[in-house]
Regions:
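Extended, solvent-exposed, non-transmembrane regions
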Residues: 1-251
Length: 251
């Protein structure tokens, strides 16, 4: 008897992950992952008020269900009251990413929200027109075709490291990914209290069978200047709100 083919769900949500090398080595992670059989998993987190990265709460969930002929994977996450080292703040990070599979993979960015972003004491407005363009491209092939004709989408892809062929179409990496930023600006750099910060906004990886969204990634390194009296420079990486959805039929 032949082995029965079945669909294996794959969904992951990371609300907060950090690798901090200074002032002391720490790994911090909070994540949920969906079993291959589907179902639903959720997690509600709070954060140590004395930590370098603080938030009021973070809620994460992943689900996998079949609707008729379609296998749907849905990843959801929201973070409220974010504060990174006292220099990066956001009122709300929220995202819902869905993958649907019938004969091919299609994706839908249901919600991608960044509200009340403050960087080193200054309010930073973000433009989400690239998100609107990406939403109109549920498959990799449609995104490639749109990028060849849309200068703003092409600029976003190029700023995230995507290369282009002679005809102006984006060229996926060896892993089959296209990268872009869903917000403009896609990155912000600044220095504060003896630390250099590089903040990446709305990093999005698009492949034929998978999409991954990282809402905020913060890279921190000590500068040559000393930290203020009583303070400490910071070194490490912080990731806030990362979603990944896909799935496949096996064997």
């Amino acid at each position: 008897m032949a082995v029965q083919r079945r669909f294996l769900y794959h969904g992951e949500v990371v609300a907060y992950a950090a690798r901090l090398d200074q002032p002391r080595l720490r790994d911090v992670k909070g994540a949920v992952a969906l079993p291959g059989t589907g179902g639903r998993v959720s997690l509600l987190e709070t954060c140590d008020p004395g930590a370098l990265v603080r938030f009021d709460y973070a809620a994460s969930s992943v689900s996998g269900e079949r609707y008729g002929e379609a296998y749907e994977t849905r990843a959801t996450c929201s973070i409220e009251g974010l504060d990174v080292c006292g220099v990066l703040r956001a009122d709300l990070l929220s995202a819902v990413l869905t993958s649907s599979h019938v004969n091919e993979h299609t994706f839908h960015e249901e919600t991608v929200t960044l509200k009340g972003l403050w960087v080193n004491g200054e309010y930073r407005a973000t433009d989400s027109q690239i998100l609107t363009r990406v939403r109109a491209c549920p498959t990799l092939s449609k995104l490639k075709a749109a990028a060849a004709e849309d200068d703003r989408l092409k600029k976003s892809l190029a700023s995230a490291g995507t290369s282009f062929d002679e005809s102006g179409r984006p060229r996926p990496t060896s892993a089959g990914d296209l990268a872009c930023h869903l917000f403009d600006p896609g990155s912000v750099r600044f220095r504060a209290d003896g630390t250099s910060y590089e903040v990446f906004l709305g990093e999005y990886l698009v492949a034929e069978r998978q999409r991954r969204l990282t809402m905020l990634r913060v890279e921190m390194k000590p500068t040559d200047a000393a930290a203020p009296a009583g303070g400490e420079s910071v070194e490490g990486t912080v990731i806030l709100l990362e979603l990944r959805v896909n799935g496949y039929t096996h064997p």
